[in-house]
Every structure is written in C-alpha cells, then in structure tokens.
C-alpha cells in the first residue's frame, strides 16, 4: 500500500501539471484547459445554431439537423483523427495537438448543445413570440431577449450533462499523444510498470472528482435559482 501511494506522490506534479514549468501544460491542467476551451466554443456555437434552426426552419433546419446527426453518429475519436490530418492541410502548418482536440470536442459538442437548446425553445408557449412581436420587438430581438434566456434556464441540467461528457471525452486525446491526464498516467505507468492499479485508480478518481465538482456547482446554482424564484 505504501509503495502504491509512493508512486502517486513521486509523480503527482507530473500528473497534475505535466511540464508546466517548461511552458508545456499537461495532466489535469491540460485536461481542464481543453474542456474549458471546447466549452467556450461549443456553447455559443450550439446556441447560435439552435437559434438559426428555430428562426428559419425549412431547409435551414433540415441541413442543420443533417449536420448534427452526422456528427453525433460518428465516434468522437474519428472526428479527432479527421481534424488531426485535415487541419494541417487546410492551414498549411501544424497545429498543436491540444488545439486540434479542443476544436474536435467543440465541433462534436456543439451538435448536442444545438439539439438541447432547440428543444428548450420549442417547449416555450408560442404566444410569447407573438406577444413580443406585438410589442414592437423584431424577430431576432424576441429570440435573443425573450425566448433564449428562458430556454437556457430550462435546459441547464441537460447542458451540464453534455459538458460533463465533454470533460470525460478529453481522455480521448491520448490517441494523438496529447499529454492530458490519461496520456501522462499511461506514461507514468510505462515508466514505473509495477503499479498500474494505483496509477489508474488515481486517474479515475480525479475524473470522478472533476465531474462531481461540476455537477455539485450546477446543483447549487439550480437550488439558489429555485429559492430566489
């Protein structure tokens, strides 16, 4: 037991921060950076796509649904591979692996965000849209100022689940050797070789704590909102 704890203690800085002192974040730090970056791209992107699908319908909605179904029907690991090889061809240069994975996560997650937010918009009474128009609001203003705030409040639990999934999906970055938590845990295991159980139990516990922390923060927010309401 002491030896198992010692291998974690000896490699804790590397598991948490990677080579941050050398300007190369890794481990838990890189996992969080990729998750936050993908969230900052996927959330507004998904909301904007939901707004387009709700506002215009018809061909626009069908094309957006087709895009979302294609993305959601493909394993994320293939999306990462595609961008890994496609982006250098489009940009004419190599992108950092963490950037490529972050973009893949954002692209993949935006499809789920779009569906969730659109469901929230469609659940609102149609009379609200008509009433806002009679008050002089333009359609875009009605969507932005009246409907979206309500829809986002209603789908917050769904969005939290989506972003917890995103946080766990950062572990797929190991496939292109991005040094996030799963990758550095594998590196430590390959170097030490005799304590894999301790290393990967620790890794799983870190993911569990990160996801539980996000869930608890969201629950407290929901509780405060319900109390205030």
Predicted segments with their positions:
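Transmembrane alpha-helices and adjacent helix-loop boundaries
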Residues: 1-229
């Amino acid at each position: 037991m002491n030896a198992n704890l010692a291998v974690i203690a000896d490699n804790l800085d590397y598991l948490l921060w990677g080579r941050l002192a050398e300007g190369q974040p890794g481990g838990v730090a890189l996992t969080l950076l990729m998750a936050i970056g993908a969230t900052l791209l996927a959330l507004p992107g998904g909301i904007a796509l939901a707004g387009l699908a709700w506002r215009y319908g018809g061909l626009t909605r069908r094309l957006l649904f087709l895009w979302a179904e294609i993305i959601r029907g493909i394993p994320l690991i293939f999306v990462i591979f595609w961008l890994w090889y496609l982006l250098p061809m489009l940009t004419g240069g190599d992108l950092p692996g963490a950037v490529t994975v972050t973009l893949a996560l954002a692209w993949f997650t935006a499809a789920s965000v779009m569906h969730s937010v659109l469901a929230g918009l469609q659940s609102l009474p149609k009379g609200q849209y008509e009433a806002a128009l009679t008050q002089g609001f333009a359609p875009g203003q009605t969507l932005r100022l009246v409907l979206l705030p309500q829809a986002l409040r209603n789908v917050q639990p769904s969005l939290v689940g989506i972003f917890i999934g995103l946080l766990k999906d950062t572990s797929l970055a190991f496939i292109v050797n991005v040094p996030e938590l799963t990758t550095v845990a594998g590196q430590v295991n390959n170097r030490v070789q005799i304590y894999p159980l301790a290393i990967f139990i620790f890794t799983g516990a870190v993911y569990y704590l990160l996801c539980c922390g996000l869930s608890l923060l969201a629950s407290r927010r929901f509780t405060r909102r319900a109390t205030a309401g």
